[in-house]
Amino acid sequence: MKISDIEIIELQNIPVTPPLFKQPLRTGVRLLKLKTDDGHVGLSQIGGFLHAATIAAIKDELLPFLKGKDPLENERLMHQMLWKFNTRAHGGVWNYAVSAIDVALWDIKGKFYNTPVWRLLGGAQKAIPAYITFGLRAYSRDELAAAAKHWVANGQSRLKVQVGRVNIRGESDPGGASAEHRSDNPAEDVGRMRAVRDAVGDDVELMADANCLMKLDTAVRWCKAFEPLNLTWFEEPIVHNDPHLLAQLRKQTHIPIAAGQWESFSRLADLVRADAVDFLNIHVLSVGGFTMGMKAAGLAQAFNLPIGNGDQFDFHLHAAVPNGWRAEIHVNNWLTANAVYKELPILANGWVTLNEKPGLGIELNDDAVKDFRKP
C-alpha cells in the first residue's frame, strides 16, 4: 500500500444557526482526502490560518514527497517531513499542512487495522466530559444568558464564553485592532459573565476565552474582576500566548489558565517548560496530527497537566490518554461538522462518546459536498 494522491475539497457558504440567531451564519471548511494505490482513503481537515498557502504547501511540496511512501509509517513520515522541510520551530503553514496529512494517515491506519483511532492510540476512555463554547460575541447580554439556559436545559453542564472584544460602552472594538488599542476596562465582559453565572447557577462549570487579545496588565485586571465568578479556566488571555507573561499571570490570579489551541509541538513545550498553564489545549490540526499530539499529551501528563480543546478529530486524542480531560464543542464548528460529516461522536448529557467504527469513524456527507463545494 502506497500513497498515491491528495485531494483538497473546499466547502463554503454552509448555513448554520446557533440558538437564538434569527439568521444563519455562513461557514466553510477545507477537507483533505489522502488516497492510496489500493483504494484506501484517509479523511482530514485543514485547520489554522492562511488556508491558501497551506493548500499550496500540501499540493506543491508535501504531496510530491509523500507519493509512493507507506501510509502506515506515520512516525517515519513525520520525522522525514520535519527534517526535509522545516527544522526551525515547526510552526505556521508547515504545521497546519503536516497536521492535516498526519490525521488522514491515522484514519487510513485505523481502517487498515479495522480499529478506531482512539483505540490505536491508547484507548484510555471511550467518553470524555464536554464543554460548550456557546458564548458568541454577537449575543447581547440577555441573549447570552438565554443561550446559556438553553444549553443547560439540553443536558450540558460546562459552558465557555468569548471575552475581550467588548468595551465598557458595550460597543465592539474595531476589527483588527491590536491588543494595545482594545478597551482595558473589563466591566462589560464581567457583566456578561455574571449574567451567565446568574442564569445557570453555581453548579455549572464556566470558562472564559480571550483568544490571545490582552497585555499582561489587562489580563490581570480581567482576572481580578472574574475571580468571584468561580471560573474553571481563563483561556489564552495573553497576546501571542507568551509563555513568560502567562507564567507571570498565573502568579497573580487563582483562576486556572489554559492555552495552546493553535500552537505547534515546540510552542506547547515552551508553555509547559515555563510553567505557564494549568491546562494544555492541544489541537491535532496544528500540533502535528496525532503523531505529535500524543507526544504533547505525554509531555502534559509528565507535568500532571490535563489536556482540553477539541473537535471531531481531537476527541480521538482525548479518549486515547488518561489526561484527556475536557472536549470542546464549539457551537459554530459543531453545527458545521454536523452538516459536513456523518457518524459524528455522540454529544449527550455533558459527554462526548466515540463510536467503534474503524479509523476516525466519520464519513463525508456527499450531499453537503455537492451543495457547498467551491467552484
Predicted region positions:
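Structured beta-strand/loop patches that form or line metal/cofactor-binding pockets in enzymes
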Residues: 1-43, 47, 338-341
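Metal- or metallocofactor-binding catalytic centers and their adjacent structured scaffolds
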Residues: 35-112
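Metal-dependent enolase-superfamily TIM-barrel catalytic cores that perform enediolate-based chemistry
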Residues: 127-247, 252
